Amino acid sequence: MAFECDKSGATYDDALMKLRLFTALALTFTLITPATASHNFIVGGDRPVTVHLPDTLANPAPLLILLHSASTSGARLESYMKIAPVAKSQGLIYIAPDGNTNAEGKRFWNASKSCCNRYSQEVDDVAYIDALIDEISAKTPVDPKRIYLIGHSNGAFMSFTYACKTDKVAAIVAIAGAMDQNPECAPTTPVSLLNIHGTADKVIKLNGGVMNNNSYTSATNTVNTFISVNRCAQATALKKDFDPIITGAETTIYDYVCGTHAELQFWKIKDGAHKPNLPSDFAQLVISFLLKQSK
């Protein structure tokens, strides 16, 4: 049975073939072209967190997780660091989750023996962060090679613990944090680190200390752990005016040369406090560091 032709001589089969080709091309274009992000959404079950999508959502897109200090919240740390607007404009999926609450009603991350599970609650925050990443990845395209953490104090402890116990993290920015003495940290792939610590920090001391009857490392030994992970050599040092309140170039930046593709920097703020004064471009500085890193 012959198919009828239109006036141009094209058959029904010709038209069907063109339609299939157009559909395939449209699908390919959709998969490889960044799209305008849809609405934010909620994940996390009984510890819900809003997933903030960027202005332009790449396929896949990097994921940034902000981890707060003890007794605060993701919202309060966001208010301090102002990460969200830069993450949105720079194409990052962004979350600022909350830790569990203890017997005093204060939030914490069960990061290590020293920080900051004061009541020895049965909380697996590594599994919680894993679940957040998995749930977000099921709903929007997350790049598994570009998962980043920013943590302050207890959140920095949690960032170190998560990076050491999983192979999901490409890079960390840690402010005023540390690790337990003799940490077990052996990720199978390099983890870039920007470690920021003030010499006048009275909460998490630069030279190490004791919390919850357990010792935590000095900032130098914390960095040494990642020198080993990333096979880094001696650092070059330069001065920077980072803290807008402290006069002069108060911050020494130690920039290490590593035998992997990872980057390692230690920013030591002379007279810097536990909650340092941040410059107006802080979010841009740390996100620029993170976006250079990949697994």
Label the model's feature ranges.
Residues 137-190, 202:
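Primarily recognizes the serine-hydrolase "nucleophile elbow" in alpha/beta-hydrolase
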Residues 65-71, 176, 197-198, 270:
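The conserved beta1-alpha1 loop
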